[in-house]
Amino acid sequence: MPSVKGTVPLGYWQFTVHLDNLFEEYVGQTWYNALSAKHEWISGKDFPYLVRKDGGDLQHAIRPDHIFRHVGGDSLIIVDAKYTAEIGKPDEIYQMLAYLNYQHSDKNPGQQLRGFLVYPGQELAFYPVTGFQHKLLCVTMPIPYSPTTPGLLEIVDTLTKESWEYQAIC
């Protein structure tokens, strides 16, 4: 039955899709599919810290989107998804540096830390962020992602094993 404004309620419904959350899940699942043979996936884990204050400490936590711990224990990969067109904004770099500098209780001595800020893009491409102690890269990843040669696993393996002075990949 047709609706007439003001006399009959309009028959419709709506829903909201949080594309940033959807992209975060997509990135996690895609990286897990590529890395699962050699890495354990940790997602949604809080890492607590304290702000020491007279009269009582303030408890807070940081939560990286995704962590991939190498089965052999020699690397820890932190992946944070950013659903935005502008890559490498200062607040995103600060956030990743907090994740990389956190004193992870399960971190082994000598374990290499790598940070990947992942953005939607037209092609799989890696852009190094220089000037910091830890290896940090901005990554653009197409939606949908289809494995290419070299694939995501091979590229991440290469980046986690080589020195920071590497040639651009992709």
What residues fall within each predicted segment?
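Catalytic core segments in nucleotide and nucleic-acid processing enzymes
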Residues: 7-170
